[in-house]
Structures are given as C-alpha cells and as structure tokens.
Design a protein with these regions (language model features):
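Class I S-adenosyl-L-methionine
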Residues: 170-212
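Class I SAM-dependent methyltransferase Rossmann-like catalytic core
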Residues: 1-41
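Conserved helix-to-beta-strand junction in the class I
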Residues: 65-66, 153-158, 167, 184
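S-adenosyl-L-methionine
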Residues: 75-123, 131
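Mobile active-site "lid"/loop adjacent to the S-adenosyl-L-methionine
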Residues: 104, 118-161, 170-175
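Conserved class I S-adenosyl-L-methionine
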Residues: 42-54
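Conserved SAM-binding loop of SAM-dependent methyltransferases across substrates and taxa
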Residues: 55-68
Length: 212
C-alpha cells in the first residue's frame, strides 16, 4: 500500500466524527479562516450551494454548522454517501435544515435550471475535481474548466455580497482565473488548507463579497 492510500490522521478523524471523507477538514479550515457559514437566528434565510458534493462531507459540515437553520442545495454526478440515508426526501429536511440534492451533470441545462431556481445563494462551495489521468497538464486543464463552470454558477446564482470557495489544481491559467475572481469579488485569495496532502497540487480560491 502506498503512503497516499494509507489511512492518515485526517481520514481516521473523519471516520470517528461521522464524515465520509477527509476533505471535510479542508472546508473547516477555510470556514474558520474566512467565517463563511454563519446563518443568524432560528428563521435564518441563509442559503448555500455545494457543487460536486459527493460523497457529502462538505454538505454534512455545512448542515451541522447551520444547526437546523437556512437552506442547502447540493449537486453531483454521483450519489451521496450512506450518512445521508436518513434524509427525508419528502420533507426535504436533514438535521432540521432544509436540504435539496440533485444527482446529475452540473453543465446540463435541466440541472443548472433546477439549481438556479433554488437561489440566490449567500455561499457557494465546491470541492469538485476531474477524474485524474496522471498527466499534470491534462488534469490541471480539466480542473480549470470545472472551476470556470463553478464561477459561472456564482455569477448567475450568488446574492450580493455572497462568497465562493472553489478547488483548483495549480497549473497554467490558474493565475488568470484568480485575477478574474478579483474583478467579481471585493476580495479573492488562494488558500491551501493544512489538511491537503503535502504532495497535492490542489488549492482553493476564496472569493469574499460578490459584486453585482
């Protein structure tokens, strides 16, 4: 077994705390640094969108942090993990929070229309990544394409002063993408959480304060 495949501290911690993947701690670090998930009051109108949600760690973190207030929409080609088995699809509730999941291609018109109809959103989070090929050039190009799709969603669905988190594989074109985000948000930064594997080329672009 390679070091990459061996269970590490973050994987073991995720299992213990009921999350399907270690990626939850990346969002936790980002959230703690930028104060992204902060609905107010029992009747909060805070709305969030998780793009590329499966297996569901980021959605679970957001739902727990929202503590029964607000609304979360999530989308992915793959289904969510067994931690969502108790999700009441008729009432659309999860842990007391209004929750909606759509399984499908985020670039498909019907999926896009459904997601946009649930907005506008105060926060969009995305840990979506392409299937890797082993070629850094190809993988980073595909990651860039996905990130651009997420940013297009942000432009269409974010509420004024809304925030965005999107994963990106560092490579050609990523600097230009960050510059683009700086024109769309009051602040846009690159941030690599400690929970990312040391050898990983992934990082996250965080946009704060969407400008219409």
């Amino acid at each position: 077994m390679t070091d990459y495949k061996k269970p590490d501290h973050w994987q073991q911690k995720a299992r213990k705390e009921g999350y399907p993947a270690r990626s939850v701690y990346k969002l936790k670090e980002i959230d703690e640094k930028f104060s992204l998930i902060k609905p107010q009051g029992k009747q909060s109108n805070f709305r969030a969108l998780d793009i590329g949600a499966a297996p569901g760690s980021w959605s679970l973190y957001a739902l727990r942090k929202m503590a029964g207030n607000g609304f979360l929409a999530a989308a992915d080609l793959s289904p969510l993990s067994r931690e969502f088995d108790n999700y009441d699809k008729n009432r659309r509730l999860f842990d007391g929070c209004n929750f909606f999941f759509i399984q499908g291609d985020i670039t498909a018109a019907p999926v896009r229309e459904t997601i946009l109809s649930k907005g506008p959103y105060n926060l969009i989070i995305s840990d979506v990544a392409p299937s890797t090929t082993g070629s850094h050039m190809i993988d980073s190009a595909r990651s860039l394409e996905l990130a651009e799709t997420v940013i297009e969603y942000a432009q269409a669905a974010l509420a004024p002063s809304g925030n965005l988190v999107v994963k990106i594989f560092q490579g050609g074109g990523t600097d230009l993408l960050l510059k683009r985000m700086k024109t769309l948000f009051k602040t846009a930064k690159s941030f690599k959480p400690e929970a990312c594997r040391g050898e990983s080329v992934e990082t996250y672009f965080v946009g704060i304060g969407f400008k219409l």
